[in-house]
Amino acid sequence: MSKDKRNTIKVVDCQVLAHYKFEGDQYILTLSSEVIALETKPGQFVHITVSDALSMRRPISIMSVDIENGTFDLLYKVVGKGTRQLSERKVGDVLSVIGPIGNGFELTNKKIPLLIGGGVGMPPMIAIAQQMKDTDHDPFVILGSEVPFPFTPELSKMGNPCPKASHTMPQLEEWNVACRLASLQDYEGVFKGYVTDLARVYL
């Protein structure tokens, strides 16, 4: 790791501002940190202390940031003891966080990037879509999940490039970023198949 990259990594005590549970043991955690919100690049992650009883930090991708309010969001799924203890943290709790970590994504000259992510691969795609929303990159996002999505899919009011899918992630719709959803489950408005199958339909 270069000295420049080390200098951007901080150890910060972050307060839990919100902690929402979704079906499939999925959670969205909102933490306060002006420095992490300001310095995060899409595709980066943090190492987070989940409880005083477990010294080993857990790596979790950053899903979105709010620079104005100095906060950032993490999406995670309970898969073991560490994430189970993290899921028990309450609003007002303070967690030790190291980050942002990783190289992150660099924007390219591609006019219409296709961003594809499923499961734990969704947060980095949402993060880069957030960065692109105020540029001329005009991304199209495909998100997939085999458990219920960690948000309530809604009918998109944007143009539909994929006739077999009509629903989107509300946050991306709010950002005016085109998105469609894929799953092997029978969810309303969601393409039935893998994200790669939906990508072929789009292309």
Predicted regions, residues:
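FNR/FR-type flavoprotein reductase catalytic core
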Residues: 81-203
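Ferredoxin-reductase
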Residues: 2-91, 147
